[in-house]
Swiss-Prot record:
This is Protein S100-A8. One of its GO terms (biological process) is endothelial cell migration. Found essentially in phagocytic cells. It is found in: Secreted; Cytoplasm; Cytoplasm, Cytoskeleton; Cell membrane. It comes from Bos taurus (Bovine). PANTHER family: PROTEIN S100-A8, S100 CALCIUM-BINDING PROTEIN. Ca(2+) 2 binds at residues 59, 61, 63, 70. It holds the Pfam family EF-hand_1. Binds two calcium ions per molecule with an affinity similar to that of the S100 proteins. Ca(2+) 1 binds at residue 33. The modification S-nitrosocysteine is found at residue 42. S100A8 is a calcium- and zinc-binding protein which plays a prominent role in the regulation of inflammatory processes and immune response. It can induce neutrophil chemotaxis and adhesion. Predominantly found as calprotectin (S100A8/A9) which has a wide plethora of intra- and extracellular functions. The intracellular functions include: facilitating leukocyte arachidonic acid trafficking and metabolism, modulation of the tubulin-dependent cytoskeleton during migration of phagocytes and activation of the neutrophilic NADPH-oxidase.
Length: 89
């Protein structure tokens, strides 16, 4: 049986592939698919930055796609913001 953390990691991978496979590439989420991912999976965190801003910030190697490592930067940033929100309440 998987632990809660293992399930969470598998969920992150599944979400990434859900959007990376839209263009048939396991290794890249492209600009329009990142926009859809952000709007669908974390709309609460789209209030401060639009999809284009996120894309420019995340595409560290500037290859025109968000690889899984770059996606994890998004997860960290959104996770930190969510953690702050939880402790405000």
């Amino acid at each position: 049986m998987l632990t809660d953390l293992e399930c969470a990691i598998n969920s992150l991978i599944d979400v990434y592939h859900k959007y990376s496979l839209k263009k048939g590439n396991y290794h890249a989420v492209y600009r329009d698919d990142l926009k859809q991912l952000l709007e669908t999976e974390c709309p609460k965190f789209m209030k401060k930055k639009d999809a284009d801003t996120w894309f420019k910030e995340l595409d560290i190697n500037q290859d025109g796609g968000i690889n899984f490592e770059e996606f994890l930067v998004l997860v960290i940033k959104v996770g930190l913001e969510a953690h702050e929100e939880i402790h405000k309440e």
